[in-house]
A protein has these predicted regions:
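Sec-dependent N-terminal signal peptides
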Residues: 4-13
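A "functional boundary" signal
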Residues: 16-232
Length: 232
């Protein structure tokens, strides 16, 4: 029976590993093509994609590929230049280097203004800055960033970004013992998440809501919360 469970586990894991290997191979081939064509835009984009591949796997690799990509990226247009800058700042955050990450996210915002980047992307950067301030125990500064981001997303169908942002605000209020405000914002996040196609964001909001409802001693709703999420 133990052997059967091991084999079943392998059948589940192998397709995932194969998909990851295929994605990585595609990124490498993209870089080779860009190099062979000596196309700086293509090379920068390929390095950007490699950095994104490693974003949740290995922060050091993401930093390396972003730094390489910035050597080729044109600085007079938003993409992939701003994505490389943003991913590099995020890699520093993932490594726990909050001050360096904050400095680099601020530079992203400066360059985003210069290049007139999409407001949804700018809102995402502001949200990241807010998270850093929250981690640095600077709740007022975090809230300023979150509110600026919310204003940019107003009347936009950016459901994934709004879900993440509202959840971050709920966490901020909860961490400062303002549970009533935390519950208000997490309910708004849950409402928006119903229109989101990003299951990670949906689960993020649901898990946070469960914790907040538990702190509010709303155990019944906390227990029932995951059922509709798992049914999606």
């Amino acid at each position: 029976m133990k052997t059967l469970f091991v084999l079943l586990g392998m059948f589940v894991i192998y397709p995932c590993l194969y998909a990851q290997d295929a994605e990585l191979q595609a990124c490498r081939e993209e870089l080779v093509r860009g190099m062979s064509q000596k196309n700086r835009d293509s090379i920068a984009a390929a390095y950007c994609h490699l950095g994104e591949y490693y974003a949740y796997r290995q922060a050091d690799s993401t930093r390396y590929y972003c730094e390489q990509g910035l050597k080729y990226a044109a600085t007079d247009k938003a993409e992939p230049y701003l994505y490389l800058l943003n991913n590099l700042a995020d890699a520093y955050f993932s490594s726990g280097q909050l001050d360096e990450s904050l400095k680099r996210f601020r530079f992203v915002l400066e360059e985003a203004g210069r290049l007139h980047w999409d407001e949804v992307e700018i809102a995402s950067v502001l949200s990241s800055v807010g998270v850093i301030y929250r981690r640095k125990e600077m709740p007022d500064s975090a809230l300023v960033c979150y509110n600026r981001a919310l204003a940019l997303l107003d009347n936009r169908e950016a459901y994934d970004e709004r879900t993440q942002l509202l959840t971050s605000i709920a966490i901020l209020y909860t961490n400062t013992a303002r549970l009533k405000e935390g519950e208000y914002y997490i309910r708004k996040a849950l409402e928006v998440s119903e229109k989101s196609d990003d299951m990670d964001m949906v689960m993020y909001a649901a898990a946070t809501a469960g914790s907040i409802f538990t702190l509010r001693e709303n155990y019944a709703e906390a227990a029932q919360l995951l059922y509709p999420v798992l049914a999606k």
